[in-house]
From Swiss-Prot:
InterPro entries: Dihydropteroate_synth-like_sf, IspG_bac, IspG_bac-typ, NO2/SO3_Rdtase_4Fe4S_sf. Its cofactor is [4Fe-4S] cluster. Binds 1 [4Fe-4S] cluster. SUPFAM superfamilies: Dihydropteroate synthetase-like (SSF51717), Nitrite and sulphite reductase 4Fe-4S domain-like (SSF56014). The gene is ispG. This is 4-hydroxy-3-methylbut-2-en-1-yl diphosphate synthase (flavodoxin). Belongs to the IspG family. Its EC number is 1.17.7.3. Converts 2C-methyl-D-erythritol 2,4-cyclodiphosphate (ME-2,4cPP) into 1-hydroxy-2-methyl-2-(E)-butenyl 4-diphosphate.
Length: 368
């Protein structure tokens, strides 16, 4: 890794816990996703949650729209280890039911679950059971009076909506909550979060909502969340993609990894290739990404097809390969090794070296 280190001053915030996962304060920025199965299909939902756990999800959100879904949630909760957030709208009784079943966090908007006595019932229950709440404001579901006041979703409108819900919880002396102000427009979301970050001390849940498909959504999320994270704003995040939820976790960690905020697994540094490449760089990277998904120890690996930039990148990598005629140069911890890799077998040889280094460096293969 380069000796140059960015200076990101994290916004000060209070710390809450979603299950055993700390959010805010000096805690690592948590990466989460949401199931897209029918919650009443317990087997499919449990399988998806476990697949998200395997790729590093810190928290998983589950939609609970009905009492039948709440009963299914009880079974789901018993079969998984990762903390679960129940996403609930309108019916306060569902929130009370999942609280009974051990939910780790409630995603509600106090303003849309009815009269104040209902809100108080949910908040009192959350207080008694030490369950945090996420207030989730979305530009697509802004209150009618705010749409009329501002004409359209604006940063000020999203902030006002969020502060309304915050005020309800403040009035009930409840402070274990986090807040999000999501929009599908990058600039609208970013400015809304900036305003909110100045207005409250609670942790912020980041996201660009309905960002799009796997490619466009990942780019949009990286731009928006990257701007905020580089300013020190954000305590947990979800990448919203019209794709397999596993991709949301991978993209989330890739964004944090790119900003050197939190690393998980291999950070591949690879050239885009040209006619100078001495081995199949693209095929090598694709193969290693798939083979090494189980590695969670942070590590920089450079895979460069020729000697133009290869040696320089290898010097600041944990492991590096620089393309050569029939055999390629191998670097370990920035030092050129006598050993060379056969270009026809470079994937197998590099995988073996990476796994050996992980075993030496971090026997528990832990995440940072």
């Amino acid at each position: 890794m380069s000796a140059f280190q960015p200076t990101i001053k994290r916004r000060e915030s209070t710390k809450i816990y979603v299950g055993n996962v700390p959010i805010g304060g000096d805690a690592p920025i948590a990466v989460q996703s949401m199931t897209n199965t029918r919650t009443t299909d317990v087997e499919a939902t449990v399988a998806q949650i476990k697949s998200l756990e395997r790729v590093g999800a810190d928290i998983v959100r589950v939609s609970v729209p009905t009492m039948d879904a709440a009963e299914a949630f009880k079974q789901i909760k018993q079969q998984v280890n990762v903390p679960l957030v129940a996403d609930i709208h309108f019916d306060y009784r569902i929130a009370l039911k999942v609280a009974e079943y051990g939910v780790d966090c409630l995603r509600i908007n106090p303003g849309n679950i009815g009269r104040e006595d209902r809100v108080r019932a949910v908040v009192d229950c959350a207080q008694d059971k030490n369950i945090p709440i996420r207030i989730g404001v979305n530009a697509g579901s802004l209150e009618k009076d705010l749409q009329e006041k501002y004409g359209e979703p604006t940063p000020e409108a999203l902030l006002e909506s969020a502060l309304r819900h915050v005020e309800i919880l403040d009035r009930l002396n409840f402070d274990q909550f986090k807040v999000s102000v999501k929009a599908s427009d990058v600039f609208l979301a970013v400015e809304s979060y900036r305003l909110l970050a100045k207005a409250i001390k609670q942790p912020l849940h980041l996201g660009i909502t309905e960002a799009g498909g796997a490619r466009a959504g990942a780019v949009k999320s990286a731009v928006g969340l990257g701007m905020l994270l580089a300013e020190g704003i954000g305590d947990t995040l979800r990448i919203s993609l019209a794709a397999d939820p596993i991709e949301e976790i991978k993209v989330g960690f890739d964004i944090l990894k790119s900003l050197r905020i939190r690393s998980r697994g291999i950070n591949f540094i690879a050239c885009p290739t040209c006619s100078r490449q001495e081995f199949d760089v693209i095929g090598t990277v694709n193969a290693l990404e798939q083979r090494l998904e189980d590695i969670i120890t942070p590590m920089d690996v450079s895979i460069i097809g020729c000697v133009v930039n290869g040696p320089g990148e290898a010097l600041i990598s944990d492991l590096g390969v620089t393309g050569g005629n029939k055999k390629s140069g191998y670097y370990l911890d920035g030092e050129r090794q006598k050993e060379r890799f056969d270009n026809e077998d470079i994937v197998n040889q590099l995988e073996a070296k990476i796994r050996a280094k992980v075993a030496r460096q971090d026997p528990k293969n832990r995440i940072i």
